[in-house]
Amino acid sequence: MKFFLDTANVDEIREANALGVISGVTTNPSLIAKEGRDFIEVVKEITQIVDGPISAEVISDDSEGMIREARELAKIHKNIVIKIPMTAEGLKAVNVLSKEGIKTNVTLIFTANQALLAARAGATYVSPFVGRLDDINTDGLQIIEDIVTIFNNYDIDTEIITASVRHPIHVLQAAKLGAHIATVPYKVLMQMVKHPLTDAGIERFKEDWRKAGLKI
């Protein structure tokens, strides 16, 4: 499984990228707005930090507007992936953009049928939202299992990005189910790094080392 960082905060991206575990970044209008900075400026800066797919989302609701915005965003950097919402207009846009060689990430997916349609329209990635499904008392990870099964059945190349990740268990289960990617908030990534027994073990080693009076 690959890891993308789900944020528009460049400081978080720098910190995570230094770990050597991040393969890309996903952003959305809400994350960009949270930073209070110019959209294009933020996206450009991210492309200078991470050498991998950077998802930037269109704002228009109609396919023509989506296509126009996507073409402009794609000019920023070769690693830009266009996030398109899972709507009929979105599928029309993906169909056109895929034929132009522009990579797309179809977002706000909540059913396996939506993922299948997006893949057939030419999406490079699909992003099922597991956390938001959990929020409405639905098993969010079931959608991952369903999409993985369907894509494997028909040799579909579209990659599955597990999105709306709320905690490390989401990541673990998605990895076991065969999702290609998990896009995680910085907080969740740090939770994955740490364990209290690891911290306790380090302190024990340090204490034993000090007692023995050893040096490197």
Curated annotation (Swiss-Prot):
Entry-linked InterPro entries: Aldolase_TIM, TAL/FSA, Transaldolase_3B, Transaldolase_3B/F6P_aldolase, Transaldolase_AS, TSA/FSA_arc/bac
Cellular compartments annotated: Cytoplasm
EC number: 2.2.1.2
Any one biological process term the GO annotation gives: pentose-phosphate shunt
One term under GO cellular component: cytoplasm
Key words, A-Z: Cytoplasm, Pentose shunt, Schiff base, Transferase
Main localization category: cytoplasm
Pathway: Carbohydrate degradation; pentose phosphate pathway; D-glyceraldehyde 3-phosphate and beta-D-fructose 6-phosphate from D-ribose 5-phosphate and D-xylulose 5-phosphate (non-oxidative stage): step 2/3
Active site residues of this protein: 83
Gene3D superfamilies: Aldolase class I
Enzyme class: transferase
GO molecular function: aldehyde-lyase activity; transaldolase activity
Catalysis performed (reactions): D-sedoheptulose 7-phosphate + D-glyceraldehyde 3-phosphate = D-erythrose 4-phosphate + beta-D-fructose 6-phosphate
Role of this protein: Transaldolase is important for the balance of metabolites in the pentose-phosphate pathway.
Family of this protein: Belongs to the transaldolase family. Type 3B subfamily.
Name of this protein: Probable transaldolase
